[in-house]
């Protein structure tokens, strides 16, 4: 691939920005709803010894915007910007976390972006999505070590948080996002995006066989 083709492949188009905005908007609403679900789970588990892990079970949901957008559009920067946008909108829609919500969005988006960057933005599959999602969970956990004073927890609590959060990241942000992206691509509505082009190529190859 020539430098001109590579530059064109990695440059954003208006339709990319529009889709990122739409995904950010949808998941801002989802994030806010899931936050309230987490509060409910935490309250229900109070006294059981498991309430500290309530949010970890659903934490993977908060990585979905960036992962899904990146999987569909497949350009550098998409995961970071979409996740950040979703967090800003979540704050505007009423999340009481204040500026910390935006900071977490930025950190989570950075984890997503690094995951795909490790594959040089050339591998768009369940493995790269899993790496991106798990890195998002690890990144935000290091932030919470200080912001939420998790550094005071016992070592096994750290293990518990990271393991549960990583599983949640895989289920929601990797597996479910891949199913959503692939499902949308098969309908043809994503034919102008990289994911749709890949589906089109796969169909052509099948016909040739």
Predicted segments, located by residue:
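Short helix-perturbing small/polar motifs within transmembrane alpha-helices
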Residues: 16-24, 103-145
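Membrane-embedded alpha-helical hairpins and interfacial helices in multi-pass inner-membrane proteins
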Residues: 44-48, 122-209
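Cytoplasmic juxtamembrane regions at transmembrane-helix boundaries
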Residues: 77-100, 194-207
């Amino acid at each position: 691939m020539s430098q001109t083709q590579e530059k064109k492949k990695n440059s954003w188009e208006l339709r990319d920005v529009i889709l990122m905005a739409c995904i950010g908007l949808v998941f801002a609403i989802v994030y806010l709803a899931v936050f309230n679900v987490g509060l409910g789970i935490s309250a229900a588990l109070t006294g059981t010894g498991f309430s500290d892990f309530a949010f970890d079970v659903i934490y993977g949901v908060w990585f979905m915007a960036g992962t899904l957008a990146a999987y569909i559009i497949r350009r550098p920067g998409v995961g970071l910007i979409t996740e950040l946008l979703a967090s800003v909108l979540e704050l505007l829609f009423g999340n009481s976390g204040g500026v910390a919500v935006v900071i977490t969005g930025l950190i989570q988006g950075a984890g997503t972006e690094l995951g795909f960057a490790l594959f040089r933005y050339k591998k768009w599959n369940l493995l790269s999505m899993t790496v991106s999602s798990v890195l998002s969970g690890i990144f935000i956990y290091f932030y919470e070590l200080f912001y939420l004073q998790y550094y005071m927890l016992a070592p096994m609590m750290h293990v518990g948080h990271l393991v549960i959060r990583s599983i949640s990241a895989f289920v929601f942000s990797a597996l479910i996002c891949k199913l959503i992206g692939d499902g949308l691509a098969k309908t043809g509505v994503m034919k102008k995006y990289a994911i749709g082009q890949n589906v089109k190529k796969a169909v052509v190859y099948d016909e040739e066989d």
